[in-house]
């Protein structure tokens, strides 16, 4: 059983390695988690000793197979909880992230699988991010950033890169949601 802090680090490393050009550097991890670089370095050494990451000072951190499996499991739990909160408890998409951050640390695989079944096995969370399946497979879809469209192009909103509450509220105020045609 991993601590909440360990789970948060693994999730951050996974996300950074999949979204940021330079990958999960000490500074990038610290920035994402709101933690000082020296504290991050200490935790990275611990994660390396647990064989969850491959850590080499001044290089981007890579997850081991075990670390990646844990990270994907955490992301699966988080995104399923977001779907539950939006679809079943009527939270708006800008309210669910922080609540899901707390719920994601419940480790019962039986609970997560039942939640998945209860929600009819959703493929994407309320922000358009893919939900890993029970085997840890992430089914991504082709997406194009809005900035790459040219005037006159039509597109359907399938996800948002910025899932901050303020940005999601801005989109709501503009009546832009997932599935909205532009």
Q: Where do the protein language model's features map onto the residues?
A:
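N-terminal helix-turn-helix DNA-binding core of bacterial DNA-binding proteins
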Residues: 4-35
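Charge-rich, N-proximal long alpha-helical rod segments
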Residues: 23, 41, 55-57
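Short, hydrophobic-biased segments on the C-terminal half of alpha helices
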Residues: 44-45
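A short, conserved structural fragment
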Residues: 48-56
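Basic, amphipathic "hinge/linker" alpha-helix immediately C-terminal to the N-terminal HTH DNA-binding motif
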Residues: 59-78
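All-alpha effector-binding/dimerization core of bacterial HTH-type transcriptional repressors
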Residues: 77-92, 98, 102-110
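Mid-protein regulatory/catalytic core that forms ligand/cofactor-binding pockets
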Residues: 104-182
């Amino acid at each position: 059983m991993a601590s909440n802090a360990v789970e948060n680090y693994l999730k951050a490393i996974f996300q950074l390695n999949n979204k940021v050009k330079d990958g999960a550097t000490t500074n990038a991890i610290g920035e994402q988690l709101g933690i000082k670089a020296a504290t991050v370095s200490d935790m990275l050494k611990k994660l390396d000793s647990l064989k969850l990451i491959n850590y080499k000072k001044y290089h981007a951190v890579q997850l081991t197979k075990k670390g990646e499996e844990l990270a994907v499991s955490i992301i699966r739990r988080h995104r399923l909880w977001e779907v539950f909160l939006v679809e079943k408890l009527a939270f708006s998409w800008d309210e669910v992230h922080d609540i899901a951050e707390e719920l994601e640390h419940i480790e019962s695989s039986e609970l997560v699988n039942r939640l998945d079944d209860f929600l009819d096995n959703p493929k994407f969370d309320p922000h358009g991010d893919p939900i890993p399946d029970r085997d840890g497979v992430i089914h991504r879809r082709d997406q194009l950033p809005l900035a790459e469209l040219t005037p006159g192009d039509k597109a359907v909103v399938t996800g948002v890169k910025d899932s901050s509450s303020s940005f999601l509220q801005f989109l709501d105020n503009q009546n832009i949601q997932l599935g909205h045609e532009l």
